């Protein structure tokens, strides 16, 4: 679970692996948002609850298809009055004031693992590609390696440095790209 403080509010982002559409056994989220094909093929569900003085004042759940995701420290981020969240193949951007959906975008063909703020934009590390999004959810560029962007030997597969991003793929090839998505080197 991720917790954020926003003004006098606490925002919780949690994994909901047992959430089932139309079930009465779920927490009753006030809003539901779906990625592409998520109503037919839901893979992951992540809940957002907003608390004021230990009372839930608003909530929503996001549901998406693609590879399964969980909640970890870089699966979501708070950017001023917006919450950005990776759920399966989709990034959702919610307005904190009322948990309305500002935008959603399919940022990877498989799974969106992580999201980071980079100046006025966002960088996502996905299973198949690295994607740069602008503040309105438009894709600025995508970069894919020769294989899945995961490491089998516990090497750090994704690292943002001051001058670019280092990525390691499944075949242990390392790439460095700049913040415009251009390849600097491949080893």
Regions found by a protein language model. Give the residues of each.
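Acidic, small-residue rich beta-repeat scaffolds with periodic aromatic anchors
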Residues: 157-187
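Repeated scaffold domains used in trafficking and secretory/extracellular systems
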Residues: 8-10, 14-30, 35-37, 65-80, ...
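Extracellular-facing segments of soluble proteins and assemblies that are Gly/Ser/Thr-biased and enriched
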Residues: 76-106
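Short loop/turn segments that connect beta-strands within the blades of beta-propeller domains
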Residues: 44, 79-80, 87-89, 118-119, ...
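Aromatic (tryptophan-biased) beta-strands that constitute blades/sheets of beta-rich domains
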Residues: 56-67, 101-111, 138-150, 185-187
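Short loop/turn segments that connect beta-strands within beta-propeller blades
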Residues: 96-98, 134-138, 178-182
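WD40 beta-propeller blade core
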Residues: 92-93, 131, 175
């Amino acid at each position: 679970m991720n917790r954020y403080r926003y003004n006098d509010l606490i925002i919780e982002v949690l994994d909901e692996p047992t959430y089932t559409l139309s079930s009465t056994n779920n927490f009753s989220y006030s809003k539901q948002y779906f990625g592409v094909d998520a109503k037919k093929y839901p893979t992951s569900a992540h809940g957002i609850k907003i608390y004021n003085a230990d009372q839930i004042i608003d909530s929503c759940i996001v549901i998406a298809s693609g590879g399964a995701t969980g909640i970890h420290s870089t699966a979501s981020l708070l950017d001023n009055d917006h919450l950005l969240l990776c759920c399966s193949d989709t990034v959702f951007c919610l307005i904190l004031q009322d948990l309305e959906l500002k935008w959603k975008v399919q940022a990877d063909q498989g799974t969106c693992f992580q999201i980071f703020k980079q100046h006025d934009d966002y960088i996502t590390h996905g299973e198949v590609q690295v994607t740069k999004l602008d503040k309105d959810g438009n894709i600025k560029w995508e970069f894919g390696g020769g294989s899945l962007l995961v490491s089998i030997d516990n090497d750090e597969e994704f690292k943002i440095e001051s001058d670019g991003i280092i990525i390691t793929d499944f075949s242990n090839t390392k790439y460095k790209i700049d913040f415009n998505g251009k390849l600097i080197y491949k080893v």
